[in-house]
């Protein structure tokens, strides 16, 4: 009997593979436990269709992330912070403040956990990197000025 594996099965194969197994093993274990489906023409067509839709969605998502990366590369955020008598910042600029400023100034919402920087503790222009997903990283500038 031929089965289409839905989940990875140790010593048999990975999800998406078509395997030839004995009838009892296929019916009583793999199909009964939800590890596989009988590899009928209908099941295989549906699997291929779902696979194509998933690939198309992935391409669409990557295209959107590339567009966002392009938008972010053109941005320079302006953040004003109080400074001491010697010109140093009080506390610095945190990831939370950067994410909030990005949302306020550019209307782009980024999770602060995806920002790849430490607390910025000096005035001037700093480059910040952000993980967008699917191995796509974007960089943008932050200008920290005295209040």
Swiss-Prot record:
Gene3D superfamilies listed in its UniProt record: Ribosomal protein L9, C-terminal domain (3.10.430.100), Ribosomal protein L9, N-terminal domain (3.40.5.10)
Keywords in alphabetical order: Ribonucleoprotein, Ribosomal protein, RNA-binding, rRNA-binding
A single Gene Ontology CC term: ribonucleoprotein complex
GO MF annotation terms: rRNA binding; structural constituent of ribosome
InterPro entries reported in the protein's UniProt record: Ribosomal_bL9, Ribosomal_bL9/RNase_H1_N, Ribosomal_bL9_bac/chp, Ribosomal_bL9_C, Ribosomal_bL9_C_sf, Ribosomal_bL9_N, Ribosomal_bL9_N_sf
Gene Ontology BP terms: translation
Known function: Binds to the 23S rRNA.
Family statement drawn from the similarity comment of this UniProt entry: Belongs to the bacterial ribosomal protein bL9 family.
HAMAP family: Ribosomal_bL9
Protein name: Large ribosomal subunit protein bL9
Organism: Campylobacter jejuni subsp. doylei (strain ATCC BAA-1458 / RM4099 / 269.97)
Gene name tied to this protein: rplI
